[in-house]
């Protein structure tokens, strides 16, 4: 049901390898996005909010970019994808740029969804306690009015135990559930695999791309943990790993 690869979502050959001829209709992703503001104010914290100096967490690829770098990254990620509907996380700094990029990719911007985390984050002054989700569409939507979703989703943060910007599964489950008129989910910035977890809960096939090898392993390990399924197929550098190697790499002791 799910496909995961370690690759670059801006490379057509990597997208083709992941999708393998399939055409997921939903784009659901959380790209690095506070990075533009961080770079231009000469900060080094990026979208994780605070640097992790203990060496325990892999660095997020593309987390510290200029605004132009962010635009190039998102433009590349939205090029030649089959998706008809898009949910993309962002913040107030990057919203205006993302709006233009999504429209340029052929989506009509339909909604601004607010994730209310319940408590403010770190810092001083007006500390942020929300993130934004842009919803865009290339085709007609068929939302079920009986589900009663509003555009403010109040859900507590996750513990970030797997990824510095890990999103709560419950949050992504609501996005997947409310778009049940579409089939298949593509996430070009896989992170900790929360998109895959939400899709597994709702029976949606998912196609997950992650640039960092360490986080790609995190996604596979998470899938095995939440499903209990150990019959995963793993190919590395063109070689399909035997069952015992997969167990040694991904399964808990």
Language model features with spans:
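S-adenosyl-L-methionine
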Residues: 1-19, 220-253
């Amino acid at each position: 049901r799910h496909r995961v690869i370690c690759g670059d979502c801006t490379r057509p050959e990597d997208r083709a390898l992941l999708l393998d001829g399939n055409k997921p209709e939903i784009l659901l992703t959380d790209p690095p996005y506070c990075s533009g503001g961080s770079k231009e104010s000469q900060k080094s914290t990026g979208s994780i909010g605070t640097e992790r100096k203990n060496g325990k967490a892999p660095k997020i690829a593309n987390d510290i970019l200029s605004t132009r770098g962010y635009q190039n990254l998102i433009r590349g990620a939205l090029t030649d994808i089959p998706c008809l509907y898009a949910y993309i996380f962002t913040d107030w700094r990057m919203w205006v740029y993302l709006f233009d990029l999504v429209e340029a990719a052929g989506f009509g911007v339909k909604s601004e969804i607010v994730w209310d985390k319940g408590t403010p984050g770190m810092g001083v002054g007006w500390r942020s306690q929300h993130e934004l989700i842009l919803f865009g569409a290339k085709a007609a939507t068929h939302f079920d009015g009986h589900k009663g979703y509003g555009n403010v989703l109040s859900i507590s943060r996750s513990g970030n135990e797997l990824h510095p910007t890990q999103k709560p599964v419950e949050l992504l489950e609501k996005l997947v559930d409310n778009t049940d008129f579409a089939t298949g989910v593509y996430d070009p910035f896989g992170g900790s695999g929360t998109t895959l977890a939400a899709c597994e809960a709702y029976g949606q096939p998912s196609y997950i791309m992650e640039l960092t090898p360490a986080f790609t392993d995190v996604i596979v390990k998470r899938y095995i943990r939440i499903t209990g399924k150990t019959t995963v197929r793993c190919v590395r550098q063109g070689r399909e790993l035997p069952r015992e190697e997969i167990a040694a790499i991904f399964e808990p002791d």
